[in-house]
């Protein structure tokens, strides 16, 4: 099918929400930056599923390149064995963190190789690829030739480029410069190509170049890659290969029996989640130019969602400094969901943040254990104690404080939805936290434990508990895109899972829990994370108790 035919077909094919992440380089195990990106994308994917959209969430691994080949040689194993070992570590972490990806991209997959080679052949046939000899400086770490633009004020190549060597060799080039004027116009007029919007200037500045892109490496120094279909002495440059994963695993140019999605349902990607370090030139320059050369229109360009970095004491994480945070150790120490919560709560999408395990504990204990967890536990316990676990008639009693709580709950749903649609997860969670605080203030104001002592106040008591349970239910439902396990436990205790099964956030309205609804028994959803000092005090207390009993 031609691209034009696919465009026409797309207008009648139901669209899916297509969200991707950068594919992780398999030269070393995952760190906290990898985990943040995948959790952020997972939260957004779950949010769009909650909205009733059909979602396709793709993540994966980048398995080719010189660094992989060199590391495998040092270890005395094949590159395939090395990437298989590292890939297994990524897969295990994503399972542990509850990453709900629908597709998995690995660049050694034969389907990806076939797509890359078809694209290379098509580009060559269109005159977009040519061969020439070039002499210049080459970054072994970044696996690319450098220009004078990469030099610092002293005229040197900075430490971010690692070892830089002078090379002269023949290679294949992509006519990147053919697309400069188009890219400038496209990026300038586009409001949705790169988000947050402040990243747009960075892309525009990067478009100002006058050299083409080397897209091959001679097999004489790199054999671990996808062979050029028209020149078997060369393999494909790792970035050119890797970027194509966004279309290859979406079914682009795939064979009918490939078991890949239908491309016309997915493309263009609604959200490609990437780190700021790979915005330019890879995703902000190379990728749109490649797509344009392949025949994609302005309307068929993806949206890039660019996130910031987790720093340590203001410094970028680095193996050489020794400050890399292992997400597996975090999940083992605190649990997967506290880690998920922290990674999207303590950072603004698009900005940098400073990683702090003490803040992870503080945010979890304050916002989840003390606030939301305590609210749910108290509300369910009091309903069991005072109302035999049954929700009363909604028309029985009302007052101004209860009316105000209904208004703030509706506002919280609206704000949460707005922020999530804007990919601002931390702000969305802040809106929910504000409502939880309003509920806890409502409890202190109404004092249901005092109302229970006065038989004449029984209608008011039942009204208070009904309002608290409704807020717990709606809050517990919404937080499910961030904390799916905790959400399920809250709704289970409220016996409300079926009541929310066919709902979407835009259909939330007061009164989801019906009159006469019976809830289940409470159980702590967010047990506090204890400090070492608290653990020591508890152990000391337990020892004293045991001594007395002995």
Regions found by a protein language model. Name each.
Residues 2-16, 56, 60, 132-137, ...:
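Basic, alpha-helical terminal appendages of large translation-related enzymes
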Residues 7-29, 43-215, 252-262, 376-416, ...:
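Conserved, charged catalytic cores of large soluble enzymes
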Residues 144-148, 271, 310-315, 366, ...:
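Short, mixed-charge aromatic SLiMs
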Residues 369, 373, 406, 410, ...:
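Generic structural concept
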Residues 388, 425-426:
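Aromatic-residue-lined binding/catalytic grooves and analogous aromatic/hydrophobic interfacial grooves
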């Amino acid at each position: 099918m031609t691209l034009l035919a696919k465009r026409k077909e797309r207008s009648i094919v139901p669209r899916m929400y297509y969200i991707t992440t950068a594919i992780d380089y398999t030269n070393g195990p995952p760190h906290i930056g990898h985990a943040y990106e995948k959790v952020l994308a997972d939260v957004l994917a779950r949010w769009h599923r909650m909205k009733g959209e059909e979602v396709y969430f793709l993540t994966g691994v980048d398995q080719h390149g010189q660094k992989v080949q060199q590391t495998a040689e040092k270890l005395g194993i094949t590159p395939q064995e090395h990437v298989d070992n590292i890939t297994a570590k990524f897969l295990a972490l994503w399972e542990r963190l509850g990453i709900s990806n629908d597709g998995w991209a690995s660049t050694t997959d034969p389907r990806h190789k076939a797509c890359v080679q078809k694209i290379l052949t098509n580009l060559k046939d269109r005159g977009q690829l040519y061969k020439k000899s070039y002499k210049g400086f080459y970054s072994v770490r970044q696996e690319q030739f450098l220009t004078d633009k990469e030099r610092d004020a002293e005229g040197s190549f900075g430490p971010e480029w690692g070892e830089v060597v002078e090379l002269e060799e023949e290679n294949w080039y992509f006519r990147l410069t053919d697309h400069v004027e188009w890219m400038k116009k496209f990026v300038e007029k586009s409001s949705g190509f790169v988000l947050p919007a402040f990243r747009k200037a960075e892309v525009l500045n990067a478009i100002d170049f006058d050299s083409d892109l080397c897209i091959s490496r001679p097999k004489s120094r790199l054999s671990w890659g996808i062979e050029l279909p028209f020149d078997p002495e060369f393999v494909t440059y790792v970035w050119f290969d890797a970027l194509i994963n966004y279309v290859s695993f979406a079914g682009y140019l795939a064979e009918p029996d490939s078991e890949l999605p239908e491309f016309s349902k997915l493309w263009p990607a609604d959200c490609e989640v990437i780190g700021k370090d790979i915005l330019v030139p890879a995703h902000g320059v190379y990728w749109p130019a490649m797509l344009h050369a392949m025949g994609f229109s302005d309307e068929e360009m993806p949206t890039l969602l660019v996130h910031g970095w987790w720093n340590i004491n203001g410094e970028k994480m680095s193996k050489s400094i020794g400050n890399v945070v292992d997400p597996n150790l975090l999940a083992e120490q605190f649990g997967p969901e506290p880690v998920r919560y922290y990674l999207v709560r303590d950072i603004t999408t698009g900005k940098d943040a400073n990683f702090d395990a003490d803040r992870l504990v503080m945010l979890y204990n304050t916002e989840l254990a003390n606030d939301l967890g305590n609210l749910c536990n108290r509300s369910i316990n009091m309903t069991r104690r005072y109302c035999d676990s049954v929700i009363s008639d909604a028309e029985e009693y009302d007052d101004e404080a209860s009316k105000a709580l209904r208004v703030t709950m509706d506002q919280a749903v609206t704000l949460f939805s707005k922020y999530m649609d804007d990919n601002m997860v931390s702000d969305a969670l802040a809106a929910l936290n504000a409502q939880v605080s309003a509920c806890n203030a409502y409890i202190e104001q109404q004092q249901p434990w005092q109302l229970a002592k006065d038989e004449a106040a029984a209608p008011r008591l039942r009204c208070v508990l009904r309002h608290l349970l409704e807020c717990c239910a709606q809050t517990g439902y919404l937080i499910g895109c961030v904390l799916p396990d905790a959400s399920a436990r809250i709704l289970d205790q409220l016996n409300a899972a079926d009541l929310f099964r066919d709902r979407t956030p835009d259909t939330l309205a007061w009164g989801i829990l019906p009159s006469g609804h019976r809830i289940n028994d409470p159980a702590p959803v967010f047990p506090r994370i204890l400090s070492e000092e608290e653990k020591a005090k508890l152990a000391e207390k337990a020892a004293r108790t045991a001594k007395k009993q002995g």
